[in-house]
Amino acid sequence: MAFAVSTACRPSLLLPPRQRSSPPRPRPLLCTPSTAAFRRGALSATTTPTPARAALPSTTGRNRIVCGKVSKGSAAPNFTLRDQDGRAVSLSKFKGRPVVVYFYPADETPGCTKQACAFRDSYEKFKKAGAEVIGISGDDAASHKEFKKKYKLPFTLLSDEGNKVRKEWGVPADLFGTLPGRQTYVLDKNGVVQYIYNNQFQPEKHIGETLKILQSL
């Protein structure tokens, strides 16, 4: 009987190791990586996209609000900028006739060159409508002069360095604020905005759309 008791006790001594090996080990292993991840900042990679995504819509949202600065039916704000020859030109100078003011990203870029040449090729139609065409970008006067000469542009190019007028008029940027917007305004002879057209990636469409409006004034 003494031997039977001793053999019965031996299995009971083996039970504690079994309990230690199964429940406690998974629990620490599951908890340790997550806390370590927070301490080491390993989760920063997952949290970084969240603010980035939130920031992008906020810039586009600001642009939409700014876009309301000059709207259809409002009087276009006057400005004075330097032309391709360095002369000061004011918008008020053209009062008494329709004016097409088109903002574009930059000289010598593919889309802007197409747009400028399309305005050039249809310039006689604008003259028949009694309208003046003015192109505005952030390039300096020297860049405008070269651009105008190279493509034989018959209309005025104005230098808005620092994009002051662009901001005052509320021209919205594209690609989350990284690309200056391409926007055209049609003003009647009293300087009132009759039409606003925005199309960054089809620059030549600006010409046909603005001519339709001019011919109806």
Curated annotation (Swiss-Prot):
Active site: C112 (cysteine sulfenic acid (-soh) intermediate)
BP terms from Gene Ontology: cell redox homeostasis; cellular response to oxidative stress
UniProt-recorded Gene Ontology molecular function terms: thioredoxin peroxidase activity
Domain Thioredoxin: 70-217
PROSITE patterns: THIOREDOXIN_2
Subcellular location per the Swiss-Prot or TrEMBL entry: Plastid, Chloroplast thylakoid lumen
GO cellular component annotations of the record: chloroplast thylakoid lumen; chloroplast thylakoid membrane; cytoplasm
SUPFAM superfamilies per the UniProt record, alphabetical: Thioredoxin-like
UniProt KW Transit peptide keyword: yes
Entry EC number(s): 1.11.1.24
Disulfide bonds: C112-C117
Record Pfam families: AhpC-TSA (PF00578)
Subunit structure: Monomer.
Role according to the record: Thiol-specific peroxidase that catalyzes the reduction of hydrogen peroxide and organic hydroperoxides to water and alcohols, respectively. Plays a role in cell protection against oxidative stress by detoxifying peroxides.
UniProt-recorded name of the protein: Peroxiredoxin Q, chloroplastic
Native species: Oryza sativa subsp. japonica
